[in-house]
Each structure stands twice: as C-alpha cells, then as structure tokens.
C-alpha cells in the first residue's frame, strides 16, 4: 500500500492518487490487446468520462481491474452504479468480477494475500477460497458497493463512504428513464463525493444513440450526433466543466480472423447486425414515405402538429392517400417556436398550444392511433430515433 497523501494536505479534499502509477500497474497485468484500455483515459484532466461501444470491448471489466488496483494501493473503494434497484440485485451483479477471478487477476494484483471475491448484500469483499471454492478467510472491509440511481435520496441519510473515489455508472443509456433521473444521479454523486476533489465518474454504455437523457443533460447530444466510431474528445459544458467523450472503434482491434469469424455467422445484409459484426453501430431502419404511385391522390390534412424534444421541433404531417388511407409523416421543423397548432412535449407545458405527452381526448387518441397502427413514416432514420426516444420517455408503446 502506498503512503497516503491528501490534496493540498487537506483530508476533506480527498486522497491524492497517482493515476500514472495506477495505470502502470494496470499495464503490468498484461490484459489482451484487443480489449478496451482504460489507461488511454485522460484521468488527470477530467472528472467525468462517457465511453460508448459495442458489447465486446471489455470496458466494465477493465475499470473493475482499476477498482481492484485502487483498493490495493490506496484502500480506495468503488461505487458500481446502475439505474434501478432491480438492476442491483445479487442475481444480476454476482458475476461482475468473473473476469478478474477466472483469469487470475485477483492473485496477480494481491499475490498470496487474496485469491477470490465474494458478494454480500450489495458489497464486494476480497476473500480466500480453498480448492472446493469454500470461503476460508475474508477481508472485513468491502472494496466495492453496488448502488442505484433510483435510491439516490435514500443514500443521503445512510451512505457514508469517505474512501469511495471511483464511480462506475454502467449501462447509462437505456430505453427508459425515470423523471429527473440525471438529477438523481448527480445527487448520488454528491452524497458520495461530499467535499472531495478526488472522485472520478466513469459512465459506460453498450448502446450508442445520441438521444439519451444523460447525453442531453451533459451537453453531449450535438457531439454524439456527429461522432462516429473511433472519435474521442474533451468537451466543455456551458459552464466550462470538461467531460471526456469517446466512441470506441471495435474494428481497430479486431484481427482478420475475428472479422472472418463474424462474417461466417452473421454475414447478412442487415444493418441492424452491424454492432455484432463490429462493422458499424447498430442502425434501426425506419419507414420512409414511398414514392407516390400513378393515379394515387395525396391530400394534406394538417401540418399543425409538432413534437418538442431534445430542444428541437418535429413536424407531424397527417396525410390522406387514396391508396394508403391516413398516415403520419414526421419531418424536421426548421423554424423556431411554432406559433399555432399543437405541440406535444415531455416537459410541463409552458405555452397555450402545448400539451404534455401525447395529450388527452378523442382527437389525440385518433392521431396517435395512426402511429400505433404502423401508419408512420420518417424523413430520415435520425428523425425516427428522435420520435422513438420521445415516446419511450413517456413509456408510450404500440
């Protein structure tokens, strides 16, 4: 264990971590070269990081090895965070350190002191097991605790972890979010951090979409929309706080054999398989309005319906076709705030022509029934993603 020093010699500011040393210790583990390398993270420059990739990059396992190294050398604990309390159940987290155990990293890091890990009531402890797997000795102190954003306010009065300095928020991007979930996450981080300046927040996800509440709140949405696999940069928020953002490119580390193996099983011309083969991110294809057929008559019913989401307006055109019947066409609205019509919003209405969610009443039900009946078209796949994300935030399904 290294000699403990504090930032500015002030214990309240937290332990002064030599991250270069920790990263050198990680390199000594000689992890496979084709998985994510956490030592490329600019940890001396930022306190927040967002790292996105497909499932095969080993992001979580790599940061959990950093977690073990921090505990060995500084007795620093880690908070492993998930969205909901259900996601933190032992049935879903007990295999979290399987890679560290099965590939011998626990013994590489701790030598003869410890050879295994066990989970007890959302706390991970180091231990020794005999040849039959029975725990014969265990550490009194936990090195990692499983936390949930959902229970943020409960932790305010019950959680005291002055040495918890690494927070790993796993699977941060999902299909559904709780109201004000980002605020709850920040509240949880504040409870853990207290007055420390040593805390690092690492956000990981196996889903890559710019339409996430978290990316929006972090000010990363516009960056994420333009980013492609392999991009990495430090982005400053409006208030000047730096955040590291990276989309890993799995292809850079895939060998010719791996690429060939993927194609031998998933060599189909379907873009939604891209994240499996590693050729690109998964792209959902949305229906685009077909070309008008000969003899078909299309009449616009209304252009006065809009969706407000991600600080943008989407126009919902309702058309009537002599061959297809009624349908909705979603397209960008290039102007500022629509002065007339109806605006559907996931925020508390602030204008006379704005309604929350999908609205109430027979008229609104008929409008959204077209969507439920798959009578919906989109000017682009990006437009489809935006509408999908808006409706998912309202828990509105077909």
Model regions and ranges:
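Phosphate/NTP-binding elements of NTP-utilizing enzymes
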Residues: 2-398
């Amino acid at each position: 264990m290294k000699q403990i020093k504090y930032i500015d010699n002030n214990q309240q500011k937290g332990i002064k971590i030599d991250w270069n040393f920790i990263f050198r210790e990680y390199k000594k583990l000689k992890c496979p070269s084709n998985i994510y390398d956490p030592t490329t993270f600019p940890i001396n420059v930022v306190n927040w990081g967002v790292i996105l990739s497909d499932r095969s990059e080993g992001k979580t396992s790599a940061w959990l090895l950093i977690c073990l190294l921090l505990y060995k050398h500084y007795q620093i604990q880690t908070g492993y965070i998930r969205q909901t309390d259900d996601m933190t159940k032992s049935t879903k987290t007990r295999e979290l350190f399987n890679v560290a155990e099965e590939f011998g990293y626990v013994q590489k890091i701790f030598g003869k002191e410890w050879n295994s890990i066990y989970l007890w009531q959302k706390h991970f402890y180091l231990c020794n097991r005999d040849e039959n797997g029975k725990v014969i000795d265990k550490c009194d102190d936990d090195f990692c605790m499983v936390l949930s954003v959902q229970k943020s306010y409960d932790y305010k009065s019950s959680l005291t972890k002055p040495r918890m300095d690494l927070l790993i928020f796993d699977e941060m991007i999902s299909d559904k979010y709780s109201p004000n979930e980002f605020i709850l996450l920040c509240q949880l981080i504040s409870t853990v951090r207290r007055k420390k300046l040593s805390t690092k927040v690492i956000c990981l996800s196996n889903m890559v979409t710019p339409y996430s509440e978290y990316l929006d709140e972090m000010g990363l949405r516009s960056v994420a929309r333009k980013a492609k696999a392999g991009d990495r940069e430090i982005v400053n928020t409006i208030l000047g706080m730096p955040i590291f953002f990276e989309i890993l490119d799995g292809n850079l580390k895939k060998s010719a054999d791996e690429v060939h193996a993927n194609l031998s099983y998933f060599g189909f011309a379907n873009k939604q398989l891209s994240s499996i083969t590693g050729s690109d991110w998964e792209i959902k294809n949305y229906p685009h309005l077909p070309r008008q057929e000969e003899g078909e008559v299309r009449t616009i019913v209304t252009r006065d319906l809009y969706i407000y989401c991600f600080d943008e307006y989407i126009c919902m055109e309702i058309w009537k076709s002599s061959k297809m019947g009624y349908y909705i066409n979603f397209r960008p609205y290039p102007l500022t705030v629509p002065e007339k019509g109806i605006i559907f919003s996931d925020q508390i209405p602030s204008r006379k022509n704005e309604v929350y969610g999908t609205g109430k009443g027979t008229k609104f039900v008929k409008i959204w029934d077209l969507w439920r009946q798959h009578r919906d078209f989109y000017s682009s796949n990006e437009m489809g993603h935006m509408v999908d994300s808006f409706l998912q935030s309202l828990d509105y399904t077909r």
